[in-house]
Amino acid sequence: MKRKIIAIFSVIFIILVFVCTGIVMQLNKRIVQNPEGTVGNTAGNLYNGGLFCEDDGYVYFSNPYDNYALYRMKPNETELEKLIGTETGSINAAGKYVYFYQKGSGSGEGFGYVISTTGVYRAEKENPHNISCLDRVLSENIVLADNSIYYNTASQQEGVALKRIDISGDNKETLLDYKVVPACVNNSTLYFAKPVENGHLMAIKLGSKKASDILSEDIYMPIVEGNLVYCIDIHNNYALVCFDLTSGEKTVLANERTDMFNVSAQYIYYQTAGDTPQLKRVSKDGSSSEVVADGAYNSINLTSQYAYFTKFGAETPVYKTPVNGAISVTTFDAAKQAVLDASKK
């Protein structure tokens, strides 16, 4: 009798072990959802390649000193750590995960090495070798909004399109059949400049497939903050301007022809064109314009501490200046040193 009871309890125990193991495995596979209003990176950073992304106390960045492998660090450039050894861009981050577009095969070194396949990827921040390809496509831009990734694609079969996919990799769908730069998300709405017919500001509500004309002005690189739209005015010599969507008022922030820009809490960093190009910054109301550096620069990415940029046509060195403090241009030596230190191990 006692042996029979022991046998029964043993069977029950084994069953419970299997059940608990299955539950744990399912929980580990479950993709943690983001709260409504989540946006994976700033529009300005994504327009400039999405090479830097700040989230939850860390800055995730593509390190050009290491073939654009994915690294992370504290905003003050301490605690540098290599996460993924492939060439990455259009970085987004929120909650448990970091999302990115994989461009190439990279060096194949480091935690979380990914096979040489371009596409949209999701990786765990604290366990970067746990990585998933959400869609193997040719793309240029992706943005995380709530629990979906919006991204553009190009293929011989489908042409160009704007697509959406859940962060789990499910429910992929085509939203628009023309090229869109998905970068600017504000108030549960994706904003973009229409690439065909005109450059009007368009908007598509998250979860919708219908795009609406918001502003009948030909613009480029719209960054929406509340009711304000910072952008480049195509028919005003590509000047840097701000539109008030409520009143319709336009404010010229900088008359110089502008190639690209990015917006911080206090300043707008912008690159001028012409015979004497300069990287400059101006207060968001259009006052206090000042030169950051002479010459042509691009890849203007901003964090809470620094503005990062590189010379046009060059990958390194990466320059930086305090994003909201006094201008003091130096080089991003910590990124280079991290690669050198890793090579000695």
Give the label of every model feature segment.
Residues 45-54, 85-95, 136-146, 177-187, ...:
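Repeated scaffold domains used in trafficking and secretory/extracellular systems
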Residues 60-62, 99-102, 150-152, 191-193, ...:
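Residue position within the beta-strands of beta-propeller blades
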Residues 26-82, 345:
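N-terminal, intrinsically disordered, polar/charged segments of Gram-positive cell-envelope systems
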Residues 272, 283-345:
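Hydrophilic extracytoplasmic domains
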Residues 74-78, 123-128, 165-170, 204-209, ...:
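Short loop/turn segments that connect beta-strands within beta-propeller blades
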Residues 1-17:
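N-terminal Sec-pathway targeting helices
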Residues 32-44, 78-84, 128-134, 170-176, ...:
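A short beta-strand motif characteristic of beta-propeller blades
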Residues 67-71, 106-121, 157-163, 197-203, ...:
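Structural motif
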